[in-house]
Amino acid sequence: MMNSRWQANKIGLINFWYYDEQEFPFVKGRMLLRGSNGSGKSVTMQSVVPLLLDGNMSPERLDPFGSRDRKMSSYLLEEDDGREERTGYLYLELKRQNSDTYLTIGMGIRARRGKNLDKWYFSLTDGRRIGKDFFLYKDSGEKVTLSKKELENRIWDGGRVIDR
């Protein structure tokens, strides 16, 4: 009997924390992150996987040590980076075992100084893959992340975009 379970295949971050665009692959549903203490392994995983599965952005949930010091907006706008706004994306690509069938869930976040976060969630259900045949940014010499409306237009009927 063929095993048709879904497995995590990769996670991706675009314009999030220290990452302009980064993917972390899984092998057989598992991932190993290596690095020295304080290099960001826990923060990276804490901010992606639980957040995509339940949408809980409370500060103590985002900080691997349980403090309330880091808010989601600080992962997009650092205090001294000079930006007034930034849109970022997080996503998790799933792959059906023994198949070339893919499903992606993700989240877009727009941070603006002094304002509440805008956030939206999306799924790609038609097999398109981020970084292969679907991109979360426009590339016109400079990569500019898609707005929520641009994402809706690009996904079209191959998935969904929803607000929480």
What are these regions (language model features)?
Residues 1-164:
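Extreme N-terminal "head/tail" segments of very large remodeling/mechanoenzyme assemblies
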